[in-house]
Amino acid sequence: MTDCRYLIKRVIKIIIAVLQLILLFL
């Protein structure tokens, strides 16, 4: 229960990066 917000922000950044890669290959 230390850095939940940090982990959430990191996961969101990863998801955004994946979405950008998908858009590049569409």
From Swiss-Prot:
Keyword terms, alphabetized: Membrane, Toxin-antitoxin system, Transmembrane, Transmembrane helix
Subcellular location: Membrane
GO BP annotations, alphabetical order: programmed cell death
Membrane topology annotation: Single-pass membrane protein
Membrane-crossing residue ranges in chain numbering: 7-24
GO cellular component, one term: membrane
Keyword check for Iron: no
Protein induction: In exponential phase. The ohsC RNA (previously known as ryfC) prevents the toxic effects of shoB overproduction, probably by repressing its translation. Expression of the proteinaceous toxin is controlled by antisense sRNA OhsC.
Range of residues in the leader sequence: none
Function: Toxic component of a type I toxin-antitoxin (TA) system. May be a toxic protein; overexpression causes cessation of growth and rapid membrane depolarization. Overexpression induces stress-response and a number of membrane protein genes.
Anything else known: Entirely encoded within a small RNA previously known as ryfB.
Designated name of the protein: Small toxic protein ShoB
Species for this entry: Escherichia coli (strain K12)
